[in-house]
Amino acid sequence: MGDFDLNVDSLIQRLLEMRSCRTGKQVQMTEAEVRGLCLKSREIFLQQPILLELEAPLIICGDIHGQYTDLLRLFEYGGFPPAANYLFLGDYVDRGKQSLETICLLLAYKIKYPENFFLLRGNHECASINRIYGFYDECKRRYNVKLWKTFTDCFNCLPVAAIIDEKIFCCHGGLSPDLQGMEQIRRLMRPTDVPDTGLLCDLLWSDPDKDVQGWGENDRGVSFTFGVDVVSKFLNRHELDLICRAHQVVEDGYEFFARRQLVTLFSAPNYCGEFDNAGGMMTVDDTLMCSFQILKPSEKKAKYLYSGMNSSRPTTPQRSAPMLATNKKK
């Protein structure tokens, strides 16, 4: 980065001006600014633990996938930082048409409010995945491949899990048969790519499945599925109350599993312009009461650059109907 002085406030201001503009308008950011965001946020990620220990109150959000206008809607609903503390569960890039604006605003907020704004790694924060599903092409079209590699270096340093007040375990994908204790997560070294198997892979890729006991094969061709019994054993062993994860489209933006011992959050409404799903976020108050805020899909369906690739996307396992928004978990 040399002597480049990153003006985060100016960047945030430009990124937020999109609220009054037409959907999909690109934000003008110099290559030096974007590179500066990656390098500075990478430093902060490495200064903080790979397994975050956070305190409520905070708002948790699931997949965003480059749907920048919807990210702004989430902040309008929950409050723009620092009005609220946030934890995002990964998958910031790919599929939507504004991955750059999305990840740049999130990294800028991380730099501006490092102790109040937290980002976990999703399976799309990985070079082999976002090389294919849109982010590489967006970087190459608007900047260059070198900048995409700078993002890769940043993503390789993201934390992979969080525990809120010793009771709520958060990650992008789910549990792992290799996970016996939290110290195993703390021992994961960064920077690191996402391997094809093992603990880090599973935290970012696994899925719950009501039809499985124990561990099962995953239709994605990566990692595993896990049953209700696995969830219950994990929570009991670690004296936890809830697993909060993302990684799957759910119709109402959130969906419970295993007698409300696990919740899936998905925060990209009308995903890829093809699904008629809502986007959800979960507010955890200081007593650990959880409530859900829902973004309905917009009336106008934006055109998504990579929606055509959705046909090759692994299908989400069918699961039971979600609980009503009035339900709360203590």
From Swiss-Prot:
Catalysis: reaction(s): O-phospho-L-seryl-[protein] + H2O = L-seryl-[protein] + phosphate; O-phospho-L-threonyl-[protein] + H2O = L-threonyl-[protein] + phosphate
A GO cellular component entry from the record: nucleus
Superkingdom of this protein's organism: Eukaryota
One Pfam family recorded for the sequence: Metallophos
Binding site for Mn(2+) 1: 63, 65, 91
Cofactor: Mn(2+)
Enzyme class (EC, first level): hydrolase
Biased composition, class Polar residues, residue ranges: 308-319
EC number assigned by the record: 3.1.3.16
Chain positions covered by the region annotation Disordered: 308-330
Any GO molecular function: protein serine/threonine phosphatase activity
Keyword terms of this UniProt record: Cell adhesion, Hydrolase, Manganese, Metal-binding, Phosphoprotein, Protein phosphatase
InterPro entries, sorted: Calcineurin-like_PHP_ApaH, Metallo-depent_PP-like, PP1_catalytic_subunit, Ser/Thr-sp_prot-phosphatase, STPPase_N
Keyword Lyase belongs to the record: no
PANTHER family hit by this protein: SERINE/THREONINE PROTEIN PHOSPHATASE, SERINE_THREONINE-PROTEIN PHOSPHATASE PP1-BETA CATALYTIC SUBUNIT
Function according to Swiss-Prot or TrEMBL: Required for cell adhesion in non-muscle tissues and in maintenance of muscle attachment. Vital for larval development.
Family listed: Belongs to the PPP phosphatase family. PP-1 subfamily.
Quaternary data: Interacts with Nop17l. Interacts with uri; uri inhibits flw phosphatase activity.
Protein name as annotated: Serine/threonine-protein phosphatase beta isoform
Gene this chain is encoded by: flw
